[in-house]
């Protein structure tokens, strides 16, 4: 039976039970009693066995502890012996030092007889007398300065001391206040300087923003002008090709009529009803020039060199006329886009460069003879008609 199993109940039988109970009940109770006794015996044996093992273990532990304590005792005895030895050595050293420090009579006599030590003692005695004299003099002066409350010198001296103390306090206040005022002034200057720096920084920022806006406007106008210039050059090249083809194939009367009609339309669009006469003059002049050009067309048909000169001169005139028609557009865009007049300088520079290029390109053409003159008249008539058509577009 283990410790976890419960013990059976104890059976109690009286003499009356033996007399009254039947045999079967008595046997049953006897069996229960036997089981109870058996359980007790088992428990007793278990306890005995556990006690024996526990005693053995405790005995072993006690033996180990005894051995450990014996070892410690030996160690402590050894330490005690070493300590006693050290103590004996220390006592010996102390006695030796005492003997050394206690001079003998012979040593004392030798030190007193030594002249150097005697001189040292004499000097010490003289210094002691001087200090005593100084102390006595200081005490006499202190007693002399002592005065009664009724003495006039004491009152004057105290008043003077109070006045000096007040003056010192006032001087300290003035110095501190002057320093504070100086610091406040410096602080105000620094604040003013910082405000000026901030205002200048704000102005610079505004100026930079304005410059950025102007640059953006200039870039936009430049892009528009470049696009217009590109478109105008393309249109002029197309018109030049068409005019060359029509000049080679059609008679001189048809270009005259076309020039007149296009000149009339251009005059109506550009000048309005009031400038009709000027538009008619332009058409007549362009027609006359075109007639002169048609008369000289047969002369230049055989030579490829003259054709190259004619094309070069036509390119010069088209670039010149294209720039003359682009300038009004650029001025219109400048008046709308740019907040300032900074773009006007750009357009004037472009006009100056165009005029310089025209003058440089006209120099080699001016010395070519009568054929170049007639080709120039022809090209003037063609350019006038092309300009009229471009203005209509």
From Swiss-Prot:
GO annotation, biological process: mRNA modification; mRNA processing; regulation of alternative mRNA splicing, via spliceosome; RNA splicing
Region of interest: Disordered: 242-393
Pfam family name, one: Wtap
Keywords: Cell cycle, Developmental protein, mRNA processing, mRNA splicing, Nucleus
GO cellular component assignments: cytoplasm; nuclear speck; nucleus; RNA N6-methyladenosine methyltransferase complex
Listed Basic and acidic residues bias regions: 254-267, 354-365
Domain of life per record: Eukaryota
Residues making up the signal peptide according to the UniProt record: none
InterPro entries tied to this protein: WTAP (IPR033757)
Localization per Swiss-Prot or TrEMBL: Nucleus speckle; Nucleus, Nucleoplasm
Biased composition (Polar residues): 272-286, 321-353, 369-393
Family, as annotated: Belongs to the fl(2)d family.
Assembly information from the UniProt record: Component of the WMM complex, a N6-methyltransferase complex composed of a catalytic subcomplex, named MAC, and of an associated subcomplex, named MACOM. Component of the MACOM subcomplex.
Role according to the record: Associated component of the WMM complex, a complex that mediates N6-methyladenosine (m6A) methylation of RNAs, a modification that plays a role in the efficiency of mRNA splicing and RNA processing.
Protein name: Pre-mRNA-splicing regulator WTAP
Organism encoding this protein: Xenopus laevis (African clawed frog)
Lineage start: Eukaryota, Metazoa, Chordata, Craniata, Vertebrata
Gene: wtap
């Amino acid at each position: 039976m283990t410790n976890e199993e419960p013990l059976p109940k104890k059976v109690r039988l009286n003499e009356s039970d033996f007399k009254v109970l039947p045999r079967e009940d008595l046997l049953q109770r006897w069996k229960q009693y036997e089981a109870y006794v058996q359980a007790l015996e088992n428990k007793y044996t278990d306890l005995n066995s556990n006690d024996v093992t526990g005693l053995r273990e405790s005995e072993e532990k006690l033996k180990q502890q005894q051995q450990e304590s014996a070892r410690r005792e030996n160690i402590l005895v050894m330490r005690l012996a070493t300590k006693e030895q050290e103590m004996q050595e220390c006592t010996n050293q102390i006695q030796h030092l005492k003997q050394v420090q206690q001079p003998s009579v012979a040593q004392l006599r030798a030190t007193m007889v030594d002249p150097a030590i005697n001189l040292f003692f004499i000097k010490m005695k003289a210094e002691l007398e001087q200090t005593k004299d100084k102390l006595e003099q200081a005490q006499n002066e202190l007693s002399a300065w002592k005065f009664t409350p009724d003495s006039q010198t004491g009152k004057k001296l105290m008043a003077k001391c109070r006045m000096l103390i007040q003056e010192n306090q006032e001087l300290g206040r003035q110095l501190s206040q002057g320093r504070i005022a100086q610091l406040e002034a410096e602080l105000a200057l620094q604040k003013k300087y910082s405000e000026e720096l901030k205002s200048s920084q704000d102005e610079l920022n505004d100026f930079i923003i304005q410059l950025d806006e102007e640059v953006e406007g200039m870039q936009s106008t430049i892009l528009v002008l470049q696009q217009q210039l590109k478109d105008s050059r393309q249109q002029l090249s197309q018109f030049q090709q068409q005019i060359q083809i029509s000049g080679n194939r059609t008679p001189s009367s048809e270009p005259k009529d076309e020039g007149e009609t296009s000149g009339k339309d251009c005059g109506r669009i550009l000048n309005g009803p009031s400038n009709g006469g000027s538009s008619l003059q332009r058409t007549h002049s362009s027609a006359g020039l075109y007639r002169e050009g048609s008369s000289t067309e047969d002369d230049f048909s055989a030579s490829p060199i003259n054709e190259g000169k004619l094309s070069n001169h036509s390119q010069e005139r088209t670039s010149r006329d294209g720039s003359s028609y682009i300038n009004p557009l650029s001025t219109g865009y400048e008046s709308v886009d740019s907040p300032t007049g900074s773009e006007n300088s750009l357009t004037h520079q472009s006009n100056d460069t165009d005029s310089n290029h025209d003058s440089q390109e006209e120099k080699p053409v001016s010395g070519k003879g009568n054929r170049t003159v007639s080709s120039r008249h022809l090209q003037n008539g063609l350019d006038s008609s092309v300009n009229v058509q471009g203005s209509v577009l």
